[in-house]
Amino acid sequence: MLNEELLPIWLDHDCGHDDAFAMLLAFHSKIFNILGISSVHGNQTVDKTTINALITLEIIGKSNCGYEVVKGVRSPMCRPEQVCSEIHGETGLDCPTAELPKPTQLPITDRPAIQVMFEKISKFYTDNQQKQKVIIVATGSLTNVALLFAVYPQIKPMVEVSLLGGSINFGNISPAAEYNILVDPEAAKVVFESGVKVIMVPLECSHKALVNEKILERISDIEKADGKQTQFIKIIKGLLLFFADNYKSTFDFDHPPLHDPLAVAYLIDPTIFKCKLMRVDIETSSHLCLGRTVVDLFSMSKLQKNVHVCTDINVDKFWDLMINAIDNCYNHLYKSNILK
């Protein structure tokens, strides 16, 4: 594909296990022009999620290929920082059964992430004669994105947002709220009320994208076709198995949901989702329902509909996209002589 045929995106995430798979899907689906990567607090501290983004570039064979990681904000707009060690471990990318590579490149730390985001996104938009908007794929807290919109409001006509977060009915960090929204509800409110097109992939979709034995077998089959046992597949399965163990101990799930790649999958093939434009408000004051995405399913609100909410997913087609990307990554690593 020529560059002008690729879909321009910016990856903004709190790189944990499922964020790493979102990166893999984005880099190895061959339809994206990835303008940059920013880290943010969430699954772990921003220091750790920044390192994890760099590690993931090593794993997927994209380090030192011109893709920069810029270190984002370390805390929510109005609240104390929180992390999710019970799911992602002490590093945010724990993988006890396989040794992860060390980063060979450094992040950008001398300028605020939102400045870098603004410069790169606005340059692309201008150079492209305003023909293509850049889609910010947000799979962590929305603090970077909210601050970007607040400090550089002129960027709003240049972007859309595809995010993994929120829910229609239930939460995963409280009875009412999903984690990415709850860690910074004020930021989510800014983004949802920005006037920018927002695509929300909620828990109702991601809790159907389960990593079961059949999926693990399909991943194993990628290297079996070559009669090999590779460090890459060992890492991929190790990350998923650690994720599975923690979902079992925390939620008693038999299989873990691979949340974050869905925000990328929507951009690859929107037809695998059912989606509806609805009014969504963010609860920022209730003790019981803090961080809830209040989704107006029946158009009761008089306020303008503001979010394209995904309500269902074709799980088989999602996994076809994900397995194909893992296979593409595997082949890329061998062709580049990264895997021996």
Curated annotation (Swiss-Prot):
Pathway: Purine metabolism; purine nucleoside salvage. Catalyzes the hydrolysis of the N-glycosidic bond of purine and/or pyrimidine nucleosides into ribose and the base. The active site is at H259. Its cofactor is Ca(2+). Substrate binds at D18, N172, E178, N180. SUPFAM superfamilies: Nucleoside hydrolase. Transmembrane segments: none annotated. One of its GO terms (cellular component) is cytosol. This is Probable ribonucleoside hydrolase. Its EC number is 3.2.2.1, 3.2.2.8. Pfam families: IU_nuc_hydro (PF01156). Keywords: Calcium, Glycosidase, Hydrolase, Metal-binding, Nucleotide metabolism. One of its GO terms (molecular function) is metal ion binding. It is an enzyme of class 3 (hydrolase). It comes from Dictyostelium discoideum. The gene is iunH. Ca(2+) binds at D14, D19, T139, D260. GO terms for biological process: nucleotide metabolic process; purine nucleoside catabolic process; pyrimidine-containing compound salvage; uridine catabolic process. It catalyses: a purine D-ribonucleoside + H2O = a purine nucleobase + D-ribose; a pyrimidine ribonucleoside + H2O = a pyrimidine nucleobase + D-ribose. Belongs to the IUNH family.
